[in-house]
């Protein structure tokens, strides 16, 4: 399953909407995704599954790239 993760690049950084970034990652569950990203110094704001029409919409975006961690 593919998940979209909204995060700040620095865990010590205060969450500011304008600095929020996102990435796509494959995982079994939200917990699995968080474990995969635990070694990164990210402040993870939100993790959501991307399926169905939402996945098709995101894949149509030129920025869509699934990260392998």
Swiss-Prot record:
Residues in coiled coil: none
Per the entry, what this protein does is: A non-essential component of RNA polymerase (RNAP).
Query: Mind telling me what this protein is named?
Result: DNA-directed RNA polymerase subunit epsilon
Q: What is its EC number?
A: 2.7.7.6
Origin species, per record, is Shouchella clausii (strain KSM-K16) (Alkalihalobacillus clausii)
What are the recorded GO MF terms, alphabetically? DNA binding; DNA-directed RNA polymerase activity
Subunit structure as annotated in this protein's UniProt entry: RNAP is composed of a core of 2 alpha, a beta and a beta' subunit. The core is associated with a delta subunit, and at least one of epsilon or omega. When a sigma factor is associated with the core the holoenzyme is formed, which can initiate transcription.
Which GO BP annotation is one of this protein's?
A: DNA-templated transcription
């Amino acid at each position: 399953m593919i998940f979209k993760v909204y995060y700040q690049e620095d865990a010590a950084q205060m969450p500011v909407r304008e600095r929020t970034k996102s990435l796509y990652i494959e995982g079994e569950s939200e917990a699995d995704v968080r474990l995969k990203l635990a070694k990164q110094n990210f402040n993870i704001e939100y993790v959501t599954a991307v399926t169905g029409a939402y996945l098709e919409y995101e894949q149509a975006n030129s920025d869509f790239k699934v990260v392998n961690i």
